[in-house]
Each structure stands twice: as C-alpha cells, then as structure tokens.
Amino acid sequence: MNFFPTHNETGKSIVRRHSQALLQNGHLERSRQLRNLAIAAELDCPKYLLAPEINQLLQFIPDLHQRTLIETLWNTGARIHEALALTKGDFYLDEETPFVVLRTLKQREPKSSVTKNKVKIRPKRVVALFDPQYVQLMKSYFATMRLKNQSQIWPIQSDNTVRNWLRSAVEQAEVNGISYVVEPITCKTFRHSFAMHLIFNGVPLKVIQAYLGHKKSSSTDVYTKIFTLDAMLHFDISFR
C-alpha cells in the first residue's frame, strides 16, 4: 500500500492519512515495529504503548480504585497531578458527547504578570471521552462510591503511589509471561499513548494540542517524529 500521495497535500493531511493507514488491517504490527525501532535506536521520540498493550496491562490492575485512575490517564492524556485534582463534578458523562474538564497544571504565566497577592487561576481544558466502556466504568464507580460533586476522586498524596501500582501490574504481567518494550511504564507513558492513539486515528494535531494542554504546537509535533522512520518503505531512492 502506498501511503504517500500522487497529488499535492498538506503535511498535516499526509500525517493523518498515513497514521490511519498504519492502523488498518495488517498495519497494527507495523506500528509496533516502528515504535520498537525508535526505542532500539534511542531516538528522541515519546515512548508509548499501543491500545492492545494497554488493555492487556489493565487486566493486571483488578482494584477498581486503581483501575479508574489509570484508565483516566489513558482516556484523557492528563498529567498525573491533573488527574489527581479531578472531582466528580469535572465529569460530564450523561451528555451526548461525554467529556471531562481538566485544570492545566503545567503551563506557567509570564513572570511579569505574577504578583504576590494575585490568585492563581488554573486554565481549564475540555477533553472528549471517546470510549463508551470508559464512560460506563466511571458512571459505575461514581454510583458505587457515592461521591459528592466537589469530592476529590483519588485523594492520593503522592504520585509515587501510582507508580507502585503500575510497577506491580507490570510484575504481574511478567509472571504471566508478558513483557513490554517500553520501560519503565510510568504515568507519562499513558499521556504519550493517548496522544499517539489519537494521531493514529486521524484526530487533527491542533485538537490533540488542545487536549494535552500544550501552549506551543511544537510540543505536540514531537509525536509525529515516528513517521519519518516509515518513509524508507515508500520511496525508491538510490544514491548509486
């Protein structure tokens, strides 16, 4: 299959079409190979898991409290401290298009605009929740826990706790003969995986930038680096 156009296209449309083609039948394995090649060559690309790998790993997190947090990282691309700050009221699960409101914690205001007495207002962003199973999981969790709208969902003091959950899940996977090329698997792995999953499914980079809370598009563009490795398959170029 030729992923590259014979007519004029923008760079973004090429990335979108190319990435979608990689996830079609027979190309999921190619996506895996590209990722593994980038890791082996120690390229400056975000390390991510593919959807089947994440769903496999989630099976080793049976605790519902832990599972809902990890699934939230995967389904929203939230930074760990953004996820830990979430309340029940931040989720809008009964809408025609379910979504969650995240408070962006990474962006910083210019020093000139910060004063001693100024109340820091965290910018908010909306992230669509595409997976119906995740939406149903959160609905069931909220019904079970009977949380108030302003109650923190995961009152965890340190993200080290979450790292320990993930470490335990990976160890359980290894006991069952399953290993992952990405190591260590951290909270940030799910953020990278979320971004790559959206790119593979053709979501525009500008939308992904908004979902991730990136101020600069260059921060999002880093996720397209992996596709440079695939160019050699589609151009017959000789230097002889």
What do the predicted segments below correspond to?
Residues 5-11, 31, 225-240:
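DNA/chromatin major-groove-contacting recognition/catalytic segments
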Residues 30-55, 110-132, 147-149:
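DNA breakage-rejoining catalytic core of tyrosine-based enzymes
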Residues 130-181:
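Active-site/catalytic core of tyrosine-dependent DNA strand-transfer enzymes
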Residues 159-160, 180-201:
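Short basic/aromatic active-site micro-motif
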Residues 51-80:
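Basic, Lys/Arg- and aromatic-enriched nucleic-acid-binding interface segment
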Residues 86-137:
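Conserved tyrosine-mediated DNA breakage-rejoining catalytic core shared by Y-recombinases
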Residues 91-93, 184, 203-224:
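Short, polar N-cap/turn motifs at the start of nucleic acid-interacting alpha helices
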Residues 108, 212, 216-237:
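Catalytic-site neighborhood detector that most strongly recognizes the C-terminal catalytic loop/helix
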